[in-house]
């Protein structure tokens, strides 16, 4: 029925997953819709013709961006040529604002409609980017209700589609079955480790997590550790940092969270995923000192963890830069596991998150917005 085409642009593993789910929903709605774009393995598996591999583009921090500048510039030039030679009916930019807001301008110059899925965190820093959004974006699809109110106030067309993680399916296996599959004992404490999906995060954070694990073992000898490896990472990348007691599972976060008693996580979307499953967690992060200094000057927020930002009150301790030490991590995990009142208080706070984020199937909601934009 349709010979329409949509370009999906994702620059990080989290965006690749969102793009894959959106692609599946779009194919259900319009089977003949042509989908192409920039992304990773997930989008490719979902039937998107990925002509730019985003694996090398998932960087954070000023210095890290400079190191990958050649790859980023090449991706920008490739997209710019695509906009001119094969203009799609719509471009869906998914998160990744530094790159995507620039390319939204190029898409608009080429006369292409633009949908932006996952708002830049203008409520946290660089609110001035709202001017670019007004100028180059036809419609915003946002994950949080307070973002919808913000854009409505600025007269930007917007849809609150809900957060995909709030409506994620629960594992079909029981906790006992999952433990048996992973060769773990549910009667002994299980701590999940989430060192991030970017190489520089792994290099900085995983060694600390491993050292913290050894300290935790001295206090709780029966503790077990499990690490769900991000899809874009090869085991060889993290093997040098691992210790024998850490069990590595290939990309199975939902099953890991179903059995975890506590978690240690790099700041990012995963903190919200953990929190929504009501697993008590500690958030850690380290970047280059210059990057952190600039961030403190520019960002006007008390917290960096997404689960803390969307909650009325803090739900996880954050250990950043020099405060992120193996001993500090171990001390907080010990409290989360062994201090019953503290643990129950955290779990109670985590239970309030899901209702405020759930609007049904987010990917289907975005697919309807896409359909309206290209067929209106």
UniProtKB/Swiss-Prot annotation:
GO terms for cellular component: membrane. It catalyses: a lipid X + a UDP-2-N,3-O-bis[(3R)-3-hydroxyacyl]-alpha-D-glucosamine = a lipid A disaccharide + UDP + H(+). Its EC number is 2.4.1.182. GO terms for molecular function: lipid-A-disaccharide synthase activity; phospholipid binding. This is Lipid-A-disaccharide synthase. The keyword Cytoplasm does not apply. PANTHER family: LIPID-A-DISACCHARIDE SYNTHASE, LIPID-A-DISACCHARIDE SYNTHASE, MITOCHONDRIAL-RELATED. It comes from Coxiella burnetii (strain CbuK_Q154) (Coxiella burnetii (strain Q154)). GO terms for biological process: lipid A biosynthetic process. It is an enzyme of class 2 (transferase).
